[in-house]
A protein has these predicted regions:
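Long, low-complexity, Lys/Arg-enriched
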Residues: 1-116, 137-197
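Acidic, metal-coordinating catalytic cores used for nucleic-acid/nucleotide bond scission
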Residues: 93-97, 121-129
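Short Gly/Thr/Asp-enriched flexible loops that form oxyanion-binding sites at enzyme active sites
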Residues: 126-141
Length: 197
């Protein structure tokens, strides 16, 4: 079993903040909210895979931020006695109609049976959270023994200019969506279990 951490890297300058979290009250300052999940869920001997979406273009800081992320996540894994694998999904800053579908296929191809998955939807293009949710749904429905443990995001602003870092767990939305899908299928079933068209 692998513990898989999926996230996107910011294209802008990032700063470390201590995030207020009802899920993990004790956490270290970070610029990458997914590391909060890592710190609190990584155990000695774990096999950890980081699937990270990195936007490549001239003038943005994503590649530099990715190197900082790898250093921080790698350090946490070493401290915990876990083995880390870093998988970079390089994407172009130029968005095309096929970009979301291409990213979806790349994420799905990297997921395996028995994965325990944590995802962070803080950074990235507007379509990234939808793509990540869709890829997780595919893994949950198609792969064997996949567990979607957590979907989180870090928020810095709460309706004012004052920075107020908060860490939110939105995993329940994933499972509500899965249940809605099942209820939709149930509504289409006839007496014999056949789908009504």
């Amino acid at each position: 079993m692998r513990k898989v951490f999926i996230s996107s890297i910011s294209m802008q300058k990032v700063n470390a903040f201590k995030y207020d979290s009802g899920v993990y009250p004790e956490n270290n300052p970070t610029a990458f909210p997914i590391t909060i999940s890592l710190e609190n869920n990584c155990q000695p001997g774990d096999e950890v895979a980081f699937i990270t979406i990195v936007t490549h273009s001239e003038g943005n800081l994503a590649v530099e931020n990715y190197h900082k992320f790898c250093e921080q996540a790698g350090s946490i894994c070493r401290e915990k006695g876990a083995r880390a694998e870093f998988i970079e999904l390089a994407v172009s800053a130029r968005i095309e109609a096929a970009s979301p579908r291409r990213l979806y296929k790349e994420i799905v191809a990297k997921l395996q049976d028995n994965d325990e998955i944590y995802a962070d939807i803080t950074y990235g293009f507007k379509y990234n959270p939808i793509v990540i949710f869709a890829a997780l749904n595919n893994a949950y429905q198609v792969r064997e023994n996949v567990d979607i443990k957590e979907i989180c995001y870090g928020n810095l602003y709460n309706g004012s200019a004052e920075i107020k870092p908060e860490y939110f767990d939105v995993t329940s939305l994933f499972y509500l969506n899965s249940l809605s899908g099942l209820m939709g299928v149930e509504g289409m079933m006839g007496d014999g279990g056949n789908v009504l068209l």
